[in-house]
Regions:
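N-terminal Rossmann-like NAD(P)+-binding subdomain of aldehyde/semialdehyde dehydrogenases
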Residues: 1-127
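Conserved small-residue-rich beta-alpha loop and adjacent elements
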Residues: 120-152
């Protein structure tokens, strides 16, 4: 049985403030295969505060630095493909062909983000004006559990 009792905030795994547990079911067997300790509002506030603290430095990074960060992220996710595949098979109960695609998808999304960033222009002419894309702030997202990588 898997027990997930930490979340990632401010560059480290931490125990959530939240105390509620959520059962994970194997859809093929309907058996509980694990539990996840859920985050709560305090954890969300901690994550938002960490993101706000990181924002000034991150917003000053160059396009090449951002591409390098995405490439490191891609390598880390791609290196865990087999672990992702195992989790997809167990947690979704999807056929092998669908599971293989689902396990590859997060790395593919990051690769697509890298490709988009490589050709993205942060300063573009617009008639007599110039449009400059500048970071504005932190955004919070709540994504569906069944396709996190596809919605970020």
């Amino acid at each position: 049985m898997h027990t997930i009792e930490q979340i990632f905030i401010n560059g480290e795994f931490v125990t959530p403030h939240g105390t509620e547990w959520f059962d994970l079911y194997n859809p093929a067997t309907a058996q509980v295969m694990g539990q996840v300790r859920l985050a709560d509002e305090v954890d969300a506030e901690r994550a938002i505060a960490a993101a706000k603290a990181a924002f000034p430095a991150w917003s000053r990074t160059t396009k090449q630095e951002r591409i390098a960060a995405l490439k490191r992220m891609h390598a880390a996710v791609a290196a865990r493909h087999d672990d992702l595949l195992e989790a997809v098979i167990e947690e979704y109960g999807a056929p092998a062909s669908r599971s293989a695609w689902m396990a590859s998808y997060p790395a593919e999304v990051i690769a697509q983000a890298i490709e988009a960033l490589e050709v993205f222009e942060f300063v573009t002419p617009a008639g007599a004006a110039t449009v400059q894309m500048t970071p504005l702030g932190v955004a919070g997202l709540i994504t569906p559990w069944n396709s996190d990588a596809g919605f970020i």
